[in-house]
Amino acid sequence: MTVTIECSEIQTKEDFHRLFTKSLYLPGFYGNNLDALHDCLTSLPQKTVINLVHTQALIRNLGPYGRAAIAAIAHAERENPERLTVNML
Protein backbone atom coordinates (compact mmCIF):
# COMPACT_ATOMS: atom_id res chain seq x y z
CA MET A 1 0.00 0.00 0.00
CA THR A 2 1.25 3.49 -0.82
CA VAL A 3 -0.20 6.49 1.00
CA THR A 4 0.47 10.17 0.36
CA ILE A 5 -0.23 12.54 3.22
CA GLU A 6 -0.35 16.27 2.50
CA CYS A 7 1.01 17.73 5.74
CA SER A 8 0.01 21.29 4.85
CA GLU A 9 -3.63 20.22 5.46
CA ILE A 10 -2.83 19.51 9.11
CA GLN A 11 -3.55 22.45 11.39
CA THR A 12 -4.14 20.70 14.73
CA LYS A 13 -3.18 17.50 16.56
CA GLU A 14 -6.71 16.29 15.91
CA ASP A 15 -6.27 16.89 12.16
CA PHE A 16 -3.02 14.93 12.28
CA HIS A 17 -4.55 11.86 13.91
CA ARG A 18 -7.75 12.03 11.86
CA LEU A 19 -5.77 12.12 8.60
CA PHE A 20 -3.42 9.31 9.62
CA THR A 21 -6.32 7.17 10.84
CA LYS A 22 -8.17 7.63 7.55
CA SER A 23 -5.14 7.29 5.27
CA LEU A 24 -3.63 4.23 6.96
CA TYR A 25 -6.90 2.53 7.94
CA LEU A 26 -5.85 2.49 11.59
CA PRO A 27 -8.03 0.39 13.90
CA GLY A 28 -10.98 1.81 15.80
CA PHE A 29 -9.11 1.44 19.07
CA TYR A 30 -6.26 3.69 17.84
CA GLY A 31 -5.45 6.01 20.75
CA ASN A 32 -4.92 9.26 18.80
CA ASN A 33 -1.48 9.87 20.25
CA LEU A 34 2.09 9.41 19.04
CA ASP A 35 2.74 6.28 21.11
CA ALA A 36 -0.31 4.64 19.56
CA LEU A 37 0.80 5.74 16.08
CA HIS A 38 4.24 4.25 16.67
CA ASP A 39 2.66 0.97 17.82
CA CYS A 40 0.47 0.82 14.71
CA LEU A 41 3.34 1.64 12.35
CA THR A 42 5.60 -1.01 13.86
CA SER A 43 2.94 -3.70 13.52
CA LEU A 44 1.66 -3.04 10.00
CA PRO A 45 0.21 -6.17 8.38
CA GLN A 46 1.52 -5.32 4.89
CA LYS A 47 4.31 -3.43 3.15
CA THR A 48 3.43 0.27 3.37
CA VAL A 49 5.03 3.33 1.80
CA ILE A 50 4.09 6.67 3.35
CA ASN A 51 4.88 9.80 1.36
CA LEU A 52 4.75 12.80 3.68
CA VAL A 53 4.46 15.92 1.54
CA HIS A 54 5.38 19.35 2.95
CA THR A 55 6.71 18.09 6.28
CA GLN A 56 7.93 21.62 7.06
CA ALA A 57 4.28 22.72 7.14
CA LEU A 58 3.64 20.10 9.82
CA ILE A 59 6.42 21.57 11.93
CA ARG A 60 5.27 25.12 11.26
CA ASN A 61 1.63 24.34 12.14
CA LEU A 62 2.15 22.03 15.12
CA GLY A 63 5.53 23.17 16.44
CA PRO A 64 7.11 20.72 18.90
CA TYR A 65 4.28 18.22 18.37
CA GLY A 66 4.98 18.23 14.63
CA ARG A 67 8.67 17.56 15.26
CA ALA A 68 7.76 14.79 17.71
CA ALA A 69 5.36 13.27 15.16
CA ILE A 70 8.04 13.18 12.48
CA ALA A 71 10.50 11.66 14.96
CA ALA A 72 7.97 8.97 15.96
CA ILE A 73 7.30 8.08 12.33
CA ALA A 74 11.03 7.92 11.53
CA HIS A 75 11.64 5.76 14.61
CA ALA A 76 8.89 3.36 13.55
CA GLU A 77 10.48 3.10 10.10
CA ARG A 78 13.83 2.17 11.67
CA GLU A 79 12.13 -0.49 13.79
CA ASN A 80 10.08 -1.95 10.93
CA PRO A 81 12.17 -1.48 7.74
CA GLU A 82 10.79 -4.57 6.02
CA ARG A 83 7.21 -3.27 6.13
CA LEU A 84 7.47 0.52 6.40
CA THR A 85 9.11 3.05 4.11
CA VAL A 86 8.66 6.75 4.78
CA ASN A 87 9.54 9.45 2.26
CA MET A 88 9.57 12.96 3.66
CA LEU A 89 9.11 15.38 0.80
Where do the PLM segments sit?
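Positively charged, polar, low-complexity stretches
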Residues: 1-89
